[in-house]
Structures are given as C-alpha cells and as structure tokens.
Amino acid sequence: MRMDGKQLDDESDDALAGLARTGSGAAFAVLVTRHRGAVCVIARNMCATLREAEQALQQTFLSAWRDVRDFPAGTSFTTWLYRIAMSTALAQRQRERGRPSYSLEPFLPAFDRAGRLVASEGRWRDVDGTIVEEMEITGVLREALECIDDHARAAFVLRDLLELPLDEAGAILETSPGVIRRETHRVRLMLRGLIDRL
C-alpha cells in the first residue's frame, strides 16, 4: 500500500524507518526533514568549520540511506541516526586535524589545600591573542568548544544543545549515563569559568 506525504508525516520514526528499510525514499525523506535540524546541530558543533559541518551533514544522511536496510530492529531510529552523525562528525574532525590544540582546563574551578574555592584571575586571551571581551559571545563559545576534547564535547552537544535524556546520549556515544553526566558537568564548569572571566 502506497502512502501519501500527509500520511507519512503522521507516522512515527520507527514506522518510517521500517518503510525506508523496504526502499521507500519518501519515508526516508520525511525522516531527513524531521531530523535535519538536530543532525545539523551535531555537525556544526562538532566540526571546526561550516564547510566541514556541511560535509558531515551530507555524509550522515548518505550513510543512513545506504545502511537503513541494516537498521537494527528494536533500536530507536533517533539514537541510530545521531550515532551516525556523531561518528561522521568525529571522523571529519580527525581528517581535519592539524589545528593547534588548546585546553579549557584552566577554567575549571580551583580549590586551595583546605578545599576552599579560589577566585579566578584576570582576562583570558583567545587563541589568536585578542581579548575575548572584544569577540561576540557566540564566537567565544564556538572557539571554546574547539578546545574541549571530542568525547566531552559530544556529551555536551547531545545533552545541553539537543537536550537529549542521559540514557539516549549514553546510547549514542556507547557509554554509561554516568560518564555523560560527568563529562557534561565538566564542560559546563569550564565554559562557566571562561564566561566568568570575560
């Protein structure tokens, strides 16, 4: 039985994935439309440049279409697709390595020997040597994300930008919810430390 576009729009992701598994390009197109924004968030925040993000976005959906027949039954389509998106974006980052690596570790809260919080110091200079205060906050945060290790960055993107539940973020990154919670908290502390010094 053929379904029209309106009927397809009303179907669940899993039902659409089942139809796509049998070769329905129309069902897959609905899934692309439905999840393009989230996959774009993953690609844009995991890749260093817009060009890399666009390549990762395209490759994610090409890979998903190519592999949809192997989509594991009983698995959430969203989890499966976002895992492909994250793997694709991380692979893109690996290909584009060669950029200097910086760390936001200095922006984590510091404590003295007695366990008291130590006040942060001064202003931070970004990677180009300009004062961060002169940059747009979005640019500062994007640069800051570039300085965070890939696994912590991935956890942060899934939890705080896509607002996925801990269990789903853990399934996408194939790790425990506890690790996701810890990594996300660590990134929040680093970003807060950075922003507090602006």
Where are these regions (language model features)?
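Acidic, proline/glycine-rich intrinsically disordered inter-domain spacer in sigma factors
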Residues: R2-K6, A110-E146
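Short, charged helix-capping/linker segments at alpha-helix termini
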Residues: R2-K6, R21-V30, C40-Q59, P177
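Sigma70-family region 2
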Residues: R21-T22, A48-T49, Q59-S76, Q94-R97
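Amphipathic, Lys/Arg- and hydrophobic-enriched alpha-helical face
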Residues: V32-L50, D67, L145, M190, ...
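Structural recognition of an alpha-helix C-terminal capping motif at a helix-to-coil junction
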Residues: Q55-L62, T75-S87
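Arg/Lys-rich amphipathic alpha helix in sigma70-family domain 2
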Residues: R69-A73, R83-L104, R113, E134, ...
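Short, Lys/Arg-enriched C-terminal cap helix and immediately downstream tail that follows
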Residues: Q94-R97, I148, R153, R188-L198
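Helix-turn-helix DNA-binding module
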Residues: R142-E146, D150-A154, L162-V179
